[in-house]
C-alpha cells in the first residue's frame, strides 16, 4: 500500500503521527506511511483535532474536508482530503 493515493479527486494519506513534537511538519516516508509530526499531545482528541487543522492549512481546504477514516485512537491513521486545493511539495513528489 502506498503512503499517498489520489482516488477520484480525493487524496488518501496513510500517516504515522508523532505527537508532542517540537514543531508541526511533514517529515517524510516512514516505511509505507507518511510521517507527520505535530505539537499537540495525544490526550482527549487534541492530537486528532490539531492534525486536522494542520492538514487543512497545508492543503488549503476547510477542516470539514479532512476526514480521519481509520486510526482515531492510534498513531497509524488513514486520512481523506476531499478535494485538495494545494498539494505540498513533499507529498506531490510521492504522487509521481
Curated annotation (Swiss-Prot):
Taxonomically, which superkingdom? Bacteria
* Xref: InterPro entries: DUF167 (IPR003746), YggU-like_sf (IPR036591)
Which cellular component, as a GO term, is one annotated location?
A: cytoplasm
A Pfam family found in this protein is DUF167
Q: Which family does it belong to?
A: Belongs to the UPF0235 family.
Name listed for the protein in its UniProt record: UPF0235 protein Shewana3_1191
Amino acid at each position: 500500500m502506498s503512503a499517498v493515493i489520489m482516488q477520484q479527486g480525493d487524496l488518501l494519506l496513510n500517516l504515522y503521527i508523532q505527537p508532542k513534537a517540537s514543531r508541526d511538519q511533514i517529515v517524510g516516508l516512514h516505511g509505507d506511511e507518511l510521517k507527520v509530526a505535530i505539537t499537540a499531545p495525544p490526550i482527549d482528541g487534541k492530537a486528532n483535532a490539531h492534525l486536522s487543522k494542520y492538514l487543512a492549512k497545508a492543503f488549503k481546504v476547510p477542516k470539514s474536508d479532512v476526514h480521519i477514516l481509520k486510526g482515531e485512537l492510534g498513531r497509524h491513521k488513514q486520512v481523506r482530503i476531499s478535494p485538495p486545493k494545494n498539494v505540498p511539495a513533499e507529498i506531490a513528489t510521492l504522487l509521481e
